[in-house]
A protein has these predicted regions:
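Ubiquitin system architectures
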Residues: 1-48, 58
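Membrane-embedded alpha-helices of multi-pass membrane proteins, especially ion channels
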Residues: 32-50, 67-82, 101-115, 145-153, ...
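Transmembrane alpha-helices of multi-pass eukaryotic membrane proteins
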Residues: 20-36, 56-70, 88-105, 128-141, ...
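A broad, low-amplitude sensor of folded, mature protein cores
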Residues: 3-10, 61, 69, 74, ...
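Hydrophobic transmembrane alpha-helices
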Residues: 46, 123-150, 154-216
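Membrane-lumen (extracellular) interface motif
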Residues: 38-61, 75-93, 109-133, 190-203
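Helix-loop boundary elements of multi-pass alpha-helical membrane proteins
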Residues: 13-24, 75-95, 157-176
Length: 216
């Protein structure tokens, strides 16, 4: 039926060890969910041992809550929203992908934000101690997360469960930018970068934005 004769040569390609896309997503997003609480709770004790005692400021606590909410959202989307074109990817990708999230958004972002440089005394009298300033960017972050979620729902509805159907998304922010899911993701991290004026947050924002531009 397929037109294959007895003398035909069948070539197979060994793709190596494979792992499901969903598993990779769950593992990479789990990193920050574990690392951020450890740094947030442990940083004051650790820095005090080196002679730099500090108390967590309002902006630090705000970033902690927003960061945890962001990655919890990503975990839930990985389970209930995302639909993948392929069932698996090379197993090594779990190391590569997790390095980005565990190292950059976990250790680098957490280590920089939850440090004496943003503690109560350090931000006192600065814009980062202004609650109106912080709440403005919290609102921007919230709108960005909602925009990102709506884009993910739109993409989910384009692909019936159990299929590999590809369709062109229409409506909403898809009429304004090619990949609103990436756009709003970058915007949410811009909000955190702006409210903290943190170099570590800026590094994560730039690296993530470049990567999402390549994906787009």
């Amino acid at each position: 039926d397929l037109g294959v004769e007895n003398v035909a040569t069948l070539t197979l390609k060994d793709l190596g060890p494979q792992i499901s896309w969903r598993t990779v997503f769950l593992v990479e997003y789990a990193g920050p969910l574990v690392i951020h609480p450890l740094i947030y709770l442990g940083a004051p004790l650790l820095w005090a041992r080196f002679g730099y005692p500090f108390s967590m400021s309002f902006v630090q606590t705000t970033v902690f809550v927003l960061g945890m909410a962001h990655f919890l959202k990503r975990e839930l989307e990985s389970v209930f929203v995302h639909r993948f074109s392929n069932a698996t990817m090379p197993a090594f990708n779990i190391v590569k992908n997790s390095t980005h999230y565990w190292l950059l958004s976990g250790l680098v972002l957490g280590g920089g934000v939850y440090s004496p440089s943003l503690g109560v005394e350090a931000v006192r009298g600065t814009v980062r101690d202004n609650h109106a300033f912080i709440w403005f960017f919290v609102l921007l972050w919230l709108l960005s997360e909602l925009g990102n979620f709506r884009a993910h729902i739109t993409l989910m509805n384009l692909r019936p469960k159990g299929t590999r159907v590809r369709q062109i998304p229409r409506g909403g922010a898809f009429e304004l930018v090619s990949c609103p899911n990436y756009f709003f993701e970058a915007l949410s991290w811009f909000a955190i970068t702006a409210m903290t004026l943190s170099l570590s947050a800026l590094i994560f924002l730039v690296v993530s934005s470049v990567q999402m531009t390549l994906w787009a």
